[in-house]
């Protein structure tokens, strides 16, 4: 059943397509009598940044102001999007998991997907989500999650208060360990983070890159930009 008036109808390859005023294009499979995921407009135009990630056969792309759209690459079908907790346009609560629909980062790690927003982060395993836990003190309570790097069972996150680290198996049950300017980072907000295979983590800020060791978890130096860069993206390639 559907709640909106159909304004047009078309049949293609045993799929009925119903055009509606407010709910997009509803699709009904006549072969098995089931409703498919509707085609719904995101309502977003001219997005400045759309992060993408792939886990298995599923392509994810974060659309600011909408959520995380999903496509099954094996079938070509669009899937139910991941949306904000308070924004569930007939999709059901199992995919309304996001703390915000302003998506900053997506990072795939095996079958897991890390989603960073301007008001928290979640780990999605394909069927359920875990919200990132934060501490009680300001220096362990990040709000904005700009980038992720996963290495050695630890998730490193570029946040508005520096580089924060969680155990990848305990993101929802343990407080993060965060490094900021008081620990030697070049600036507060860290917009990019990468980890290499030698136990080093690199956090990019608007004033340079902080060089961090995984054990002990501390800042050991920095690469200074010399001037404000607005952003210092980092990437590790081989050695």
Question: Predicted segment positions?
Answer:
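Short coil-to-beta transitions that initiate beta-strands within beta-rich domains
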Residues: 1-12, 38-55, 83-109, 132-151, ...
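An edge-strand/N-cap motif at the start of beta-rich repeat modules
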Residues: 1-2, 35, 208-223
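Generic beta-strand structural signal
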Residues: 11, 28-30, 54, 71, ...
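Conserved beta-propeller blade signature
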Residues: 15-18, 58-61, 112-115, 154-157, ...
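Loop/turn residues immediately N-terminal
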Residues: 21-25, 64-68, 118-122, 161-164, ...
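Short loop/turn segments that connect beta-strands within beta-propeller blades
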Residues: 29-33, 72-76, 125-128, 167-172, ...
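Blade-level signature of beta-propeller repeat domains, shared across WD40, Kelch, NHL, RCC1
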Residues: 202, 207-215, 235-239
């Amino acid at each position: 059943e559907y709640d909106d008036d159909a304004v047009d109808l078309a049949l293609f390859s045993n799929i009925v397509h119903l055009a509606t005023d407010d709910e997009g294009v509803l699709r009904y499979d006549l072969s098995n009598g089931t409703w498919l995921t509707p085609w719904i407009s995101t309502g977003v135009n001219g997005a400045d940044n759309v992060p993408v990630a792939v886990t298995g056969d599923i392509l994810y792309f974060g659309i600011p102001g909408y959520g995380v759209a999903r496509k099954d690459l094996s079938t070509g079908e669009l899937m139910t999007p991941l949306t904000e907790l308070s924004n569930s346009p007939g999709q059901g609560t199992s995919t309304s998991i996001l703390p915000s629909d302003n998506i900053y980062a997506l990072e795939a790690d095996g079958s897991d997907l890390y989603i960073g927003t301007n008001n928290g982060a979640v780990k999605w395993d394909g069927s359920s989500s875990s919200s990132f836990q934060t501490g009680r003190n300001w220096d362990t309570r990040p709000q904005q999650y700009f980038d992720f790097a996963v290495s050695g069972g630890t998730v490193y996150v570029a946040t508005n208060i520096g580089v924060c680290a969680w155990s990848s198996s305990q993101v929802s049950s343990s407080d993060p360990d965060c490094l900021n300017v008081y620990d030697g980072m070049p600036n507060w907000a860290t917009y990019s983070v990468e980890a290499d295979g030698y136990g080093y983590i690199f956090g990019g800020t608007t004033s340079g890159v902080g060089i961090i060791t995984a054990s002990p978890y501390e800042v050991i130096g920095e690469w200074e930009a010399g001037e404000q860069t607005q952003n210092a993206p980092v990437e590790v390639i081989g050695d």
